[in-house]
């Protein structure tokens, strides 16, 4: 064991832009980076309860050996692929959120990620993302290049539902190259058509703002996630400002052959985060950035017969940044007492993490955005 202390939509190439006119809002001088671990990362092998005999009984083949765990406490440690994060843990810039979930969880990929993106209740259906509502409550400055940038996916996720200036792109260079050749997606509504010229100008302006071309000393990992992190840092390097960036690391739906797949993905994640920190330190932005992971759900504690795990509930997530108060938050799932479908009870409502960002990072009233009071998780320094 290793121990360590209603929008107008335009698309071109692989990019999509949604713009809506709105008044200038409050200044968002702190950035949120969301990292989606798409498919449902297995939290139990991410933060390993290496002293719990139930863990090894439920996972005779998949359990991480005690000697391989990167120890964080006398009970829990990280998957060995996450060893690059040990320095962040020692620096108290890594918060580990345990048992994250919500009441009456849904185990469908599509429905559960919708719940996370909209911050809705399990039986509530909304079209507007939680960030869409946040920026409606307190708009970002019009001088910003955009409210948010989605990298590596055409799905706007928490920025969906209209009313945001959101840019979704797969490749910055392609986005810039094709910006002036944009063609409108057919939409209905005279009000939208009346803004065509304004939107076209906004597209070109946004492309120009994203053309940071900052020459980083940081070396970024190869692969799609490393490229996405590099693109995110280029977006943040532009002086015009952006409130949120989301990047996606996909492949976590590990019903079969989980061990190798998750090890590779967690290594990609850890290496990407280390590069992200290095680049943001170069930009003098690390102390003004918080990184938050999320996924549609976790995995069941009991391994299946295919060398994998099935859809589960309570999960582990990370918050990282220069102003993060590092440590363990929440409580580890009680895997000795599982529900009838083989899942543990959650400890932290995921909307508490959102409330932390809204109330304590941006100064936006979380009750208005989330439709109720959710206790913030104190992973940010005062």
Kindly give the residue locations of the regions a language model identified.
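Phosphate-handling catalytic cores of nucleic-acid transaction enzymes
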Residues: 311-313
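Feature for exported/extracytoplasmic and membrane-associated proteins, marking the mature portion
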Residues: 1-283, 302, 316-382
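Short Gly/Pro-enriched turn/cap motifs at secondary-structure boundaries
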Residues: 307-308, 348
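Metal-dependent active-site segment of extracytoplasmic phospho-/sulfohydrolases and closely related
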Residues: 279-305
């Amino acid at each position: 064991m290793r121990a360590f202390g209603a929008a107008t939509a335009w698309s071109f190439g692989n990019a999509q832009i949604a713009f809506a006119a709105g008044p200038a809002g409050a200044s968002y001088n702190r950035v949120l980076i969301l990292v989606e671990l798409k498919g449902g990362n297995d939290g139990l092998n991410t933060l390993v309860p290496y002293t719990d005999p139930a863990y090894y009984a439920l996972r005779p083949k998949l359990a991480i050996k005690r000697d391989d765990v990167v120890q964080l406490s006398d009970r829990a440690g990280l998957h060995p692929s996450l060893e690059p994060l040990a320095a962040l843990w020692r620096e108290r810039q890594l918060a580990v959120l345990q048992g994250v979930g919500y009441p009456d969880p849904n185990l469908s990929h599509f429905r559960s990620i919708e719940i996370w993106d909209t911050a809705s209740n399990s039986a509530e259906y909304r079209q507007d993302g939680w960030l869409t509502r946040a920026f409606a409550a307190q708009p970002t400055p019009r001088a910003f290049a955009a409210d948010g940038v989605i990298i590596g996916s055409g799905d706007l996720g928490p920025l969906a539902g209209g009313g945001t200036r959101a840019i979704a792109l797969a490749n910055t260079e392609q986005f810039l190259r094709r910006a002036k050749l944009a063609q409108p997606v057919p939409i209905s509504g005279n009000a939208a058509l009346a803004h065509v010229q304004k939107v076209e100008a906004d597209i070109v302006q946004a492309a120009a703002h994203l053309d940071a071309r900052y020459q980083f000393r940081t070396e970024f990992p190869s692969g799609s996630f490393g490229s996405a992190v590099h693109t995110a840092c280029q977006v943040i390097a532009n002086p015009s400002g952006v409130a949120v960036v989301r990047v996606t690391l996909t492949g976590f739906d590990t019903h079969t052959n989980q061990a190798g797949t998750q090890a590779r993905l967690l290594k990609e994640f850890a290496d990407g985060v280390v590069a992200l920190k290095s680049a943001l330190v170069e930009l003098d932005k690390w102390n003004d950035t918080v990184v938050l992971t999320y996924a549609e759900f976790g995995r069941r504690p009991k391994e299946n017969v295919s060398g994998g795990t099935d859809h589960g509930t309570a999960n582990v997530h990370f918050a990282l940044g220069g102003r993060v108060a590092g440590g363990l938050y929440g409580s580890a799932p009680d895997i000795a007492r599982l529900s009838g479908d083989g899942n543990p009870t959650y400890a932290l409502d995921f909307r508490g993490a959102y409330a932390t960002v809204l109330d304590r990072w941006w100064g936006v009233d979380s009750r208005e955005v989330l439709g109720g009071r959710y206790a913030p998780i104190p992973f940010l320094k005062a």
